[in-house]
A protein has these predicted regions:
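Two-metal-ion RNase H-like nuclease active-site motif
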Residues: 1-9
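Conserved catalytic motifs of the protein kinase core domain
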Residues: 2, 13, 24-28, 68
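A short acidic Gly-Thr/Ser loop motif
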Residues: 8-12, 74
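Acidic, metal-ligating active-site segments
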Residues: 11-20
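RNase H catalytic domain
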Residues: 19, 54-78
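A short, polar/acidic, helix/strand-boundary loop motif
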Residues: 22-51, 75-78
Length: 78
């Protein structure tokens, strides 16, 4: 089924949650997060949210490569 990658950034951490849609219902495949280093803590919101997307794509590359998927973020500019 189709994959959905949810990402988020805060000053302290980035997170990524991978879901897979099966029969119209999303099921969590894996959760992941990491703390931000001192440079990442200085990012503006757009840079931070993009960092979270890149983190999620790298973390779940093996699941997503060659698949149709959607990225969901709470930052409207992205």
């Amino acid at each position: 089924g189709k994959f959905v990658l949810y990402t988020d950034w805060s000053i302290d951490a980035v997170s990524a949650i991978l879901h897979q849609e099966i029969d119209g219902v999303e099921h969590v495949i894996e959760y992941s997060s990491k703390t931000c280093n001192r440079h990442e803590r200085n990012y503006c919101p757009t840079e931070g949210e993009l960092l979270a997307i890149i983190y999620g794509l790298a973390k779940y590359r093996s699941y997503l490569l060659g698949q149709i998927f959607t990225i969901v973020t709470d930052h409207s500019a992205l």
